[in-house]
Structures are given as C-alpha cells and as structure tokens.
C-alpha cells in the first residue's frame, strides 16, 4: 500500500472581497516529489502557497496534511534594513531549531557567509540563506516561493541542482512557485500551470535537446533546467472569464 500524500488539496477556493484568487484547485504532493507551479502575475500562485501553509483561510475545499508534517517555507519577498546589524549566523539562530544553523548553511554550501551582514548578500546568496532557514525545521515538505528570483540562468541551474540534492538527501517533497512560464527545474515531477485554476499540467522536457541552450549556458545548466510546453483547452479573457479554445492569454512571457 502506498503511503498517504504529504499534503492533499481538494477543490481549494479562495475568495477575498468577492474576488476569486484561486478556484477548485486539487492536487497531491508525495514524499520525494517535486511540483512546480507556474503562472502569470496575479494568477494566485502565492495565494496557493499560503493556503497550503495554512495561513490563508479557504472559502471552499480543504487542505489535508499528513499527521506531524513539518514544512520548511522560503518566502517570495524578504528585506533586511541596512541599518540592522544582523549577521547570517544570528539570522539563522533566530529561527526554528537555532542549534542547526551551521548544518543548514553547510547543506546550502554557504558556510563562508556566516559572519557577513544580511544586507550585504547578493541575490543568489540571500536565496540560499533563506533556503538554509527553511531546512532548520528538518522538513518533510519544502515550499519555495520564487526561489530563483533575482538569480541569473546559471545561478538558477546551480540552485535547482542543490534543491534536487536536498530532496534526495532528506527524502522530502517540494513545491516550487515560479513566474517563469517556460523554464523550470528539470527534476520536476509535475508542472502545474495556474491562472486562478489549474489550466494544464504535465512533465517538463529537458533542455539537453536544445543545442543553442547548451552552447550558451553549458551542460550543467542543461541538466538542471527544462522547458515546459503548455497544453490548454481554454483561454482567459482580460476580465478573468474563461472561454473554450487553446488560445492562451498569459501575456508576452508566454510565447
């Protein structure tokens, strides 16, 4: 018998002041599984992550969590005031399980920034430190909201390699949220395209089949990144209504 999923969303709907943010969203996340949620701005991706975490009240549906489930969360936005003398070490010591700060930094390959002020970190360094903080809970599930934000393509490939390695080491599940409609983590088991509801879902295709990409970014990036091709049976009007047909209105990003 297969173990129950780490988390199950059933017909999850969130409405705020009469506006539907997400509607009838249903999917499972299992141990060792990586799911990437993509979609345009305003599609409800962060709302979905908050609903999964239990910090966003539901209008309808339910979120079922495996008993004792531990979740490590990496937020989309994080700002440290430059006037605040907070080092990376101290930042991690303020988190859950502060004694694990050194182990967490080692896992994300960032021991060398332990004494560095938080506000001096580069975009890629900050993302890894936030990932280290999420790891301090020894999570069964990682929820990473825009983990590659502010990171170039080569940095994305390295970050995705690290996430894959952590998944293999910790045997945890992972939900990644991304605004990139096409370029996703190659190790993703399932891509969910969200625009209030799940428009389509499927497996990414490896970019190792794209010689131009390999020539530009190298074979390491090709192993970590993949292209997702959308297959929609409907499209969205600008007022949010849904109509039959494969035309897609995700915007210019979705070429």
UniProtKB/Swiss-Prot annotation:
GO terms for biological process: response to zinc ion. Pfam families: ABC_tran. Its EC number is 7.2.2.20. It is found in: Cell inner membrane. It is an enzyme of class 7 (translocase). NCBIfam families: PRK09544.1. This is Zinc import ATP-binding protein ZnuC 1. It comes from Hahella chejuensis (strain KCTC 2396). The lineage of its organism: Bacteria, Pseudomonadati, Pseudomonadota, Gammaproteobacteria, Oceanospirillales.
């Amino acid at each position: 018998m297969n173990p129950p999923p780490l988390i199950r969303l059933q017909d999850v709907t969130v409405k705020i002041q009469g506006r539907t943010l997400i509607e009838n969203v249903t999917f499972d996340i299992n141990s060792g599984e990586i799911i990437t949620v993509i979609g345009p701005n305003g599609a409800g991706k962060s709302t979905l992550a908050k609903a999964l975490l239990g910090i966003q009240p539901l209008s309808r549906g339910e979120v079922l969590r495996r008993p004792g489930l531990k979740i490590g969360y990496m937020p989309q936005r994080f700002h440290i005031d430059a006037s605040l003398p907070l080092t990376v070490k101290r930042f991690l010591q303020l988190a859950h399980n502060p004694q694990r700060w050194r182990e967490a930094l080692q896992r994300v390959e960032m021991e060398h920034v332990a004494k560095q002020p938080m506000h001096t970190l580069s975009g890629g360094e900050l993302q890894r430190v936030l990932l280290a903080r999420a790891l301090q809970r020894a999570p069964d599930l990682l929820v990473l909201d825009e983990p590659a934000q502010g990171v170039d393509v080569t940095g994305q490939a390295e970050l995705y390699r690290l996430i894959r390695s952590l998944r293999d080491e910790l045997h945890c599940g992972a939900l990644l949220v991304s605004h990139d409609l096409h370029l996703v983590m190659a190790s993703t088991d399932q891509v969910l395209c969200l625009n209030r509801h799940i428009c389509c879902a499927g497996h990414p295709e490896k970019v190792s089949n794209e010689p131009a990409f390999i020539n530009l970014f190298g074979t390491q990036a090709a192993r970590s990144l993949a292209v997702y091709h959308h297959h929609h049976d409907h499209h969205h009007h600008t007022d949010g209504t849904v109509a039959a047909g494969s035309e897609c209105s995700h915007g210019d990003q979705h070429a």
